Curated annotation (Swiss-Prot):
The lineage of its organism: Bacteria, Pseudomonadati, Myxococcota, Myxococcia, Myxococcales. It is an enzyme of class 2 (transferase). This is Leucyl/phenylalanyl-tRNA--protein transferase. GO terms for biological process: protein catabolic process. One of its GO terms (molecular function) is leucyl-tRNA--protein transferase activity. One of its GO terms (cellular component) is cytoplasm. Its main location: cytoplasm. It comes from Anaeromyxobacter sp. (strain K).
Length: 233
């Protein structure tokens, strides 16, 4: 199948036309309107500094139902100890920049380019991109970030600078998302790490159908706070 070159308008081809590896289109920009259009259609950007902007819609898709979250026994002990304080939206830019700096086995460089950082910081300021942080005292020990639309949360990346810090942030984030009415956490592509937490692969068509239902719900815009469902008023 051909790889589509995107027009200036924030429009995308049908995800069913993606290559077997999930690559759907090339080009365009990372302006908020295009990014939010992409997420609403089950498409996300993933590229490195040496390539043009690439857009993906893999089949199958890794997802997590918040109600199906599995917490390994060893991590349950860490959670009970309260080793980390977990927050939301207290350090979004620090989290995404730390994710960009993280060493990734088998990868040279990072896909979270400066252009990507700027784009997601803009989404954060619009109230649709969010971070969860794990703190050890006053030190940022780990965290993750993603995009929220309707009752769906699209996880993007996570990092840890201390043992289990990102895992604690992940578990607390999924628990909070469930309490806030989120029905679907998009994990994009399979990793054994996320499978251990209950994520599973589903066909792209099923993912898109579930996403469409999730988008019928209102988006939790604004700064999020843990300890309650939804952002502060």
């Amino acid at each position: 199948m051909p790889i589509f070159r995107l027009p200036r308008e924030p429009a995308f081809p049908d995800p069913a036309l993606a290559e077997p590896d999930g690559l759907l289109a090339v080009g365009g920009d990372l302006e908020p309107e295009r990014l939010l259009t992409a997420y609403a259609e089950g498409i996300f950007p993933w590229f490195d500094a040496e390539s043009p902007i690439l857009w993906w819609s893999p089949d199958p898709r890794l997802v997590l139902d918040p109600a199906a979250l599995h917490v390994p026994r060893s991590l349950q002990r860490t959670l009970r100890r309260g080793a980390y304080r977990v927050s939301a939206d207290e350090a979004f830019e620090r989290v995404i920049r730390r994710c960009a700096e993280r060493d990734r086995p088998g990868q040279q460089g990072t896909w979270i380019t400066g252009e990507m950082v700027d784009a997601y910081v803009r989404l954060h300021r619009l109230g649709v991109a969010h971070s969860f942080e794990a703190w050890e005292g006053d030190a940022l020990a780990g965290g993750l970030y993603g995009v929220s639309l309707g009752a769906a949360f699209f996880g993007e990346s996570m990092f840890a600078d201390a043992p289990d810090a990102s895992k604690v942030a992940f578990v607390r984030s999924v628990e909070w998302l469930r309490s806030a009415g989120v029905e679907l956490v998009d994990c994009q592509v399979r990793t054994e790490h996320l499978v251990r937490f209950g994520a599973r692969e589903i066909p792209r068509a099923e993912f898109l159908a579930r996403l469409a239902r999730a988008l019928e719900q209102p988006t939790l815009r604004g700064r999020w706070q843990l300890g309650g469902a939804g952002p502060p008023s």
